[in-house]
């Protein structure tokens, strides 16, 4: 069977009406009457199987396994009159890629056209379009039909024939994503459009209100093309569902896997995307493993990008640096992974509950991993054992949402000794009941100048320092450095005695920072 490619533009508002409209508007010839020039309509049925050529991949990139075909599920199939170009009927393939479409015809030659649109239910559609907003289509060769005929026409969309098989991989990957979301939320996501074409050099990203844009092998990607990068596709799908089902405050921008100082809004957003590709694959491995394109033995938590020189990382087995703190996207992904499975093994349902039902309610503070932590506590009211477990999951990535070794230190009496000069103490700004305050005592000598300073700020910390005199009331110095996250106060002791360094989260912290965080306090003599 010969095939050819078309990119078509059409009104998507008549997907299921064409058959009815054509049957109603084309006049039928009545028996014994003068039919004049009206065409005689006959019925026939076309059945078949639609499949596309996929690519198997693993940690080292594409494996080269061929031929490797998969059913093209839920895609739009049109029966087109060869002579007039009219679409006689439409339907969709099922989960096996099979279709069966009855139609009326008056001329004897038609062809089957497969369009780059998947229709899962009503308005829950997925489209892949070119940057000029045209749908892709693959057509069979023309064939003759006769009244009452049932004709089989299979369509195999193969790379070797120069067909846009990658377009239909994009459709199928996102169809799996839609099914994943429905299993969690009870409904498919709203319509999604992905934009891809050969040579697109504008990057891969999700744009709210528009869709997902994918590299096509040129420009900034250095030849990278993403139509078969399933993990990259699902990463962007994670941004899409965050926009449609949750809340995403990310400012966007450049991000690197080893960057431990990202804007917390960005690290959360990208970490959710990194986690999403693993979560979808994990769900598929349990529910429909035939939809996966990974080679045997590849973990669901392995993220693969087949750009030029393929790279991958396994975020489930990471240990130590450099992937740590709330400001690192991989640390966020691993934390979510170990909540869903692994260490925590709570399943995806509570993760989705916080994502869908709590995060959209957050106001006054940005959505980041702090907000997700707060949501877990709010949605689950965990007992002590669960709280300790999730604290361990977070602290494995040095995300310290728990009491530090110096607590309780919210008051002027602390169990541990006063801090010594030049000694560094690491503190966590965290209190589940409200804003945390660390009060650190030290012994000062009258007439001596000192510098109290915070440094090594992690997890989005932004500190504000006050130094209080021995009467515990008089403030002898304060600093809320509005241009830097760290703070420092220089002062001279007016008398011998115990002075107190009070550290809180800055009230003027930028949106990139957090309410919590980790810092190191040191007092030095000037």
Please provide the spans of the model-predicted regions.
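Bacterial Sec-dependent N-terminal signal peptides
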Residues: 23-48
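Short, ordered, surface-exposed loop/turn motifs in non-cytosolic proteins
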Residues: 53-84, 189, 460-463
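Short, acidic Ser/Thr/Gly-rich low-complexity loop/linker segments typical of extracellular
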Residues: 81-98
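Zn2+-dependent metallopeptidase catalytic core
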Residues: 100-104, 151, 155-193
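Short pre-active-site segment immediately N-terminal to the catalytic Zn-binding motif
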Residues: 214-233
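C-terminal edge strands of extracellular/lumenal beta-sandwich accessory domains
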Residues: 401-419, 438-441, 458-459, 466-472, ...
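Non-catalytic, beta-strand-enriched accessory regions in extracellular/secretory proteins
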Residues: 421-450, 464-466, 484-490, 500, ...
